[in-house]
Structure formats: structure tokens, C-alpha cells
Amino acid sequence: MRLFDKIVDKMVSEKVPRKRRRRLIIYIAVITLLSMTTATVAWFSVNTFAGVQNLDLHISMSAQLKVAMEDYGTDLEKYGKVITNEMIDEYLQKQNTRLADIVLDPVTTRAGDVFTNQRGAERVPNKRSYLEFECYFIATEEMWVHLTTESTKQGEDDGTKVTTTSTGAKADVVNCARVGFTTAENGTAIYEPNRGTPVNGQATFDLPGGAMVYTDNTRIFHIEQLKPTKVTIRLWIDGEDPQCDDDVQDAQLGVQLGFIGCDENNVPIS
């Protein structure tokens, strides 16, 4: 209302006739109301955000592919097959936060490395915007790393999937989530679960709903033999996605990522 007061004061000082002044004020009020009601199409209009419930990474036991939160060079004993919430929390401690405190305020991106909000302002990670952390993959032979929906070991259900415990319309949060994987060699690959029409010029991929089939589209990065490869992983809610509306506010998101190594013909390495 301060804006209207300033306008009125200015019109009074400039001796604008009272009748014309009333018309101008009503016109300005209508325009402002329209801008408020049409500003939000897909983006949240109220910032109560979505939260990250869990985020786990699992690697197939068959191929000699391992991962760690730090670069341990070629000391394979210090790498493992799993990255847990607790390990991600240790990384986030450097930024005075933890996974349980991460909230996903809608952002969008074209290439998966620079993120902006609805007003076009650039956002930084892990600050009520999007989640970002780094990890290092290493393999005993050259390979392409793929996402997989298959369980990484027998008897487990740890393949790639994005889930929610939220119900009703909030469950649509799984449709507007994105996960990006960035390396110096291969750039960024963006996984879009339940992929729809691409938004904001993004090049994304989805995984098959049935039996897993490995193709060039499921590749996320390449690894040289015994060369630690830094991978930046980002999780965000894309505000340009049609499902990213007020219905999914306060939803909880769970992300499980399964990785497998394949040869140049996309055949899993045993």
C-alpha cells in the first residue's frame, strides 16, 4: 500500500483533479491485482517448499566401479559401493547445513549448471534452493557409467527411483524433480523421472518402466581406468515443469540412485 500512498501524494502535490485521481488509483490497483494473479503458472506462489526425505547412491556389485565423497587417488580400499544420507551430511556440514534441513525452492536451468528462480535471479546451492554435492567415482577399467533401475545386488530394491510419502496432489512432486550429473569431460546429463515435454530447452532422459535397457541415452559419464572422476550431483524441483504448482508444496521427496558400468556397446561389465 505504500506505493499507492506515494502515488496519491504525488497527484495531490501536482493538483490532479479528485475525480481523475480516483480513476487512476482504481486503474493502478486493477493492474497490480492482475500482475499478482497471473505471475504464477507452474511455479509455487507461496514459499513453503518441498523437502528431501532421503538420498542414497548404490553401485552394482558386478563391475569394479566404486565411489567416495573424497578423492583418494588410486587407493581402491578407501572407495565403496554406497553413499548414504550420513555421508552427504558430512559433506554438507562444510556449509553449515544437513540433508534434513534442505528445502527445495523451485528453480530452473537450461544446461543443469546455472540455476535461477522465477524472477531470473541466480541461486546458490544448499541455501533454500537446490541440493548439490560432489563425489568421486573410480573403476578398474574404462567404462561408461549408466543409471539403472535394476537392483545393484540380489535381494535388494536399490535401483534408481524417485519416490514420495506424500499423498494426493502432493505426490506429483516426483514428476517435477530433476537430478543432474556433471563431469569435466562429459558436461551435464539430466535425469527427469516420468519425463514429459522438455521445459526451458533442457535435454533430459528417463529410464524405462519395464526391463532395463542400456543405451547411449542412459549414459551419464565416462571413466578412464583408475582415474578418479569428480561428479557433481544436483537435485532440484523445476519451476517450469507444469506439475510444479501449489499442490506439491510441503511434499517430501526420496531419491535413490543406482549406477552400473557398461562397455562402449552399452553392455554391462561383469
Where are these regions (language model features)?
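Short, polar/proline-rich extracytoplasmic segments that appear immediately after membrane translocation
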Residues: 3, 9-98, 249-253, 261-270
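Extracellular adhesion/glycan-binding regions together with long Ser/Thr-
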Residues: 9-20, 85-124, 187-228, 234
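Short, structured coil/loop segments at alpha-helix boundaries
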Residues: 16-18, 42, 157, 174, ...
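Surface-exposed interaction patch
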Residues: 36, 48, 99-198
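A composition-driven signal for long, intrinsically disordered, charge-rich low-complexity tracts
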Residues: 41-43, 51, 68-72, 93, ...
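Generic "edge-of-domain/loop-turn" microfeature
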Residues: 49, 62-64, 74, 88, ...
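Generic structural hydrophobic/aromatic packing signal, biased to beta-strands
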Residues: 57, 67, 135, 179-181, ...
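C-terminal, structured domain-capping segment
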Residues: 111-158, 201-270
